[in-house]
């Protein structure tokens, strides 16, 4: 199977809407935040308030990590403007569809901003038929490496 097929399966497993932990860091101060995420156009999208520390951390250090279940993602975040700006129309539509309460409470707040994370690497553990398959996806070089992890019972 080629990288594009693994990439499609990877994004399909994340789902169009999910909750993930976002890890940010700046000047030796790491933090982790549970985020409501949308997955589309090869990226992971979320929103936050410009008043929160994670906004400043991303502004100063766009390297972030995300985690959902047994999937770990490293990527680069960009700040994409207010959720209701024209360029974020798809984001706003999907927020309204999947998270109408969050959309109503937060998307209209002036200080809200959309965050787009482009994955660079991912480690995706899949547990099937007694084998742990570890998919190491390299989105930059468009490569995948699959490891089988067998835990020996001592």
Give each language-model segment a name:
Residues 1-4, 29-41, 131-136:
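Charged, low-complexity, helix/coiled-coil-prone segments
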Residues 17-50, 55-58, 64-68, 76:
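Short beta-strand segments
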Residues 14, 58, 94-95:
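A generic structural signal for nonpolar/aromatic side chains embedded in well-ordered alpha-helices
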Residues 72-154:
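Charged, gly/pro-rich active-site loop segments
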Residues 6-9, 54, 90:
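Hydrophobic alpha-helical segments typical of transmembrane helices
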């Amino acid at each position: 199977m080629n990288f594009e097929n693994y990439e499609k399966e990877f994004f399909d497993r994340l789902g169009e809407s999910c909750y993930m932990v976002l890890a940010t860091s700046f000047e030796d101060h790491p933090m982790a935040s549970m985020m409501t995420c949308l997955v589309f156009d090869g990226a992971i999208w979320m929103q936050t308030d410009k008043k929160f520390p994670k906004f400043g951390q991303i502004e100063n250090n766009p390297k972030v990590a995300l985690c959902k279940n047994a999937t770990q993602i490293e990527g680069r975040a960009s700040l994409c403007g207010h959720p209701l700006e024209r360029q974020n129309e798809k984001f706003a539509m999907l927020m309204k569809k999947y998270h109408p309460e969050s959309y109503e409470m937060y998307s209209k707040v002036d200080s809200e901003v959309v965050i787009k994370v482009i994955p660079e690497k991912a480690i995706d553990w899949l547990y099937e038929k007694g084998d742990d398959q570890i998919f190491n996806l390299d989105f930059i070089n468009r490569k995948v490496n699959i490891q089988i992890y067998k835990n020996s019972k001592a």
